[in-house]
C-alpha cells in the first residue's frame, strides 16, 4: 500500500513539475512599461509588443507597418530580366510599398476620420476602399457646408424610439441629426445635375471613384479626407455606392432628373489594376473593420498572387465563416496574401488601436523626417 502511494505521489509530482523547453533567446520575454522611467508615449507603445494579449498584437502590427513603410526596391536584388531603369540604385531606393487602406463607414463617423485625413493629406497611402457611409459622413462633416451640424457623442443605451421622435440617428454611442442628411441633399443634388449634363455634353462615363473624386473637389475643405484624396490623386473606391445616404440621393435624383449612369465595371478594372500593375513595388494592406472594404482590397491583391504585408484591425470572429472575422491565414489560402507575407490581426476596436498604430508608424516616421530636414 505504501509503495502504491509512493508511486502515485511520484506520478503526480512528475505531472506537476514536467520539465520545460528552454525559451530563452527563442521567444520575447513578457514585461510591461515601467512608469518609473517617466511618461514616454513612444516607449509605452513600443512596450506593447512584450505586454501580451492584444497589446502584443498591436505591437506586432506596428512592426509590420514600419516594415511596410521602410521597404524599398533597393532591399531586393535585381532580377535577371528587369529593365535598365530598375537597375539604377536611385530608382530602386525611390520605389516604395504601395499601401492599400480600407475602412468601414463608422470610423468616418468617429474621430478616426481625422487620423485618416492626416494620412491622405500627407499622401501616406496610395489606394482607399470604403463603404458609402465612409463617403457621405466625410462630406457631411465638411466645414465648407456651413449649415451642417457635426456628429455628437451620445450613449449606446439611448432608446431608439425616443431618438426617432427627435430626428436623431444613433451610430453606436454617436448621434447624427437627421437634418444633416436633408442639407446634404441640398448640397449634392445640384452636383449630380451638373454631372448628368457633362455625361451628355462631354460623353463622360462616370464611375463610383470618379463620382467620389468629383465630390472631393466640390467639398474644397481641408478637414475632409476626400478633398485631400482628390488633391493628391489618391483613388477612393466604393463598390457599394448605393448602400447609404448617397444611394438615397442617387435614387431620388433618378426621378427628378433621370439618366445619370455610374459604371462599376470600370472601377473593378481600376482597383484590380492598382494591385496587378504595382510591380516592382510590394503591396501592403491596412484594413479597419470588415465587410466590403476588407474583401475588395484582399481580392484585388489576389490578382497579383497576394499582398506582401497585411494588418487587420477588427472585433469580428471567424467562427461563423464570415470574411469580416477571417484571420490573414484564411486569405493566404485564397492567394489574397502571399504565403511569405508579414501579417497580423489585432482583435480590437479600431478607434482605440488605429490612432496608436499611426502614432508609432506613419506619424513618427514623418516627424523624424521633418526634424532631420
UniProtKB/Swiss-Prot annotation:
Cofactor: NAD(+)
A Pfam match: DS
An example Gene Ontology molecular-function term: deoxyhypusine synthase activity
Reactions catalysed: [eIF5A protein]-L-lysine + spermidine = [eIF5A protein]-deoxyhypusine + propane-1,3-diamine
Record InterPro entries: Deoxyhypusine_synthase, Deoxyhypusine_synthase_sf, DHS-like_NAD/FAD-binding_dom
Alphabetized UniProt keyword annotations: Hypusine biosynthesis, NAD, Transferase
Active-site residues per Swiss-Prot or TrEMBL entry: 336
Residues where NAD(+) binds: 105-109, 131-133, 137, 243, 290, 315-316, 349-350
Cellular component GO terms held in the UniProt record: cytoplasm
Family membership: Belongs to the deoxyhypusine synthase family.
Listed PANTHER family: DEOXYHYPUSINE SYNTHASE
Function, in words: Catalyzes the NAD-dependent oxidative cleavage of spermidine and the subsequent transfer of the butylamine moiety of spermidine to the epsilon-amino group of a specific lysine residue of the eIF-5A precursor protein to form the intermediate deoxyhypusine residue. Also able to produce homospermidine from putrescine.
Protein name per the record: Deoxyhypusine synthase
